[in-house]
Design a protein with these regions (language model features):
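Flexible inter-repeat linkers and adjacent short helices
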Residues: 1-140, 148
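Structural detector for internal amphipathic alpha-helices that build alpha-solenoid repeat scaffolds
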Residues: 12-26, 48-57, 80-91, 112-124, ...
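Amphipathic alpha-helical scaffolding segments comprising HEAT/armadillo-like alpha-solenoid repeats
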Residues: 28-37, 59-71, 91-105, 127-136, ...
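Short inter-helical turns and helix N-cap capping residues of alpha-solenoid HEAT/ARM repeat scaffolds
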Residues: 42-43, 73-74, 140-142, 171-172, ...
Length: 264
């Protein structure tokens, strides 16, 4: 019996054994998009492992995801994201990335959990690119130049005189309001009247018209001139102002026939 068991044991030992199974590491087969999506996982540990796995990745698609993780509710994840951005700041493309993702950088400051030293690094990098600041404020429209102008004023990234020059000619109406507010508070009535009559922007004409009308600066000749504005809202305001002064429209049109006004 013992001899039979020994023979069976020898036979079993001669059967080829399968190779030990290698534990699959899920990160190996995941694309960058999938890994970036994992950074939004509900599991804080999963986010941590993903950040650790991506620590040497400098693909541009990852940058905004790291900005978002600066406010991660798990402290180690905030630290990992901050360390990654700190390393990235030594690379030549970092400045352009900060510019491209400025709105996300601004959003970081509005969150409860932040990493102040990295926020300062990001903002200082944007501030150093004065050509970008000036071009964006003067030539673009929408949320980006509006938010950027707030930061420029708050942190004095551009000298006030230069910013006034840029905002006066800015394409975005909200950015122009910085210049408008400044001149209505600081310039003379004569200067405001000059800007009113020479501005090519509807919002500037209307706002300055309203300011000067409320201050009782405009005479009937000024209002008549504005009545011929190419902007309907300004024309309508001027018509209202003339009616308030009991302007004799009949006599005016007798002296200035509509055909003559149209040709002019």
């Amino acid at each position: 019996m013992a001899e039979r068991q020994a023979l069976e044991q020898i036979h079993i030992s001669n059967i080829p054994q399968p190779e030990p199974e290698i534990v699959d590491i899920p990160f190996i087969r995941k694309s960058l998009d999938e890994l970036i999506w994992l950074l939004r996982d509900y599991d804080g540990y999963a986010r941590q492992r993903t950040l650790e796995h991506l620590k040497d990745c400098y693909e541009q698609e990852l940058f905004p995801a790291l900005l978002f993780r600066l406010s991660d509710y798990v402290e180690i994840n905030r630290e990992l994201a901050a360390q990654h951005i700190q390393r990235w700041s030594q690379r030549p493309e970092f400045a352009q990335l900060c510019i491209d993702h400025f709105l996300q950088i601004a959003a970081v400051q509005q969150r409860v959990r932040t990493v102040p030293e990295i926020e300062n690094l990001l903002l200082n990098t944007v501030a150093e690119n004065t050509d970008y600041l000036q071009h964006t404020v003067s030539s673009e429209q929408g949320q980006l130049p509006r938010v950027l102008s707030i930061y420029i004023v708050k942190y004095q990234w551009i000298e006030q005189e230069k910013l006034l020059e840029l905002s006066k000619a800015a394409k975005d109406q909200i950015v122009r309001k910085f210049w408008l507010d400044h001149i209505t508070q600081n310039e003379s009535a004569q200067k405001l009247l000059f800007e009113l009559k020479h501005s090519q922007f509807r919002d500037v004409q209307y706002h300055l018209f309203d300011v000067l009308y409320q201050r009782k600066i405009l005479n009937p000749e000024d209002i008549i001139e504005l009545w011929h504005s190419r902007f309907l809202s300004v024309m309508d305001y001027a018509y209202f102002a003339l009616r308030q002064q009991n302007f004799d429209f009949g006599n005016y049109f007798n002296q200035h026939p509509i055909a003559l006004l149209s040709s002019q």
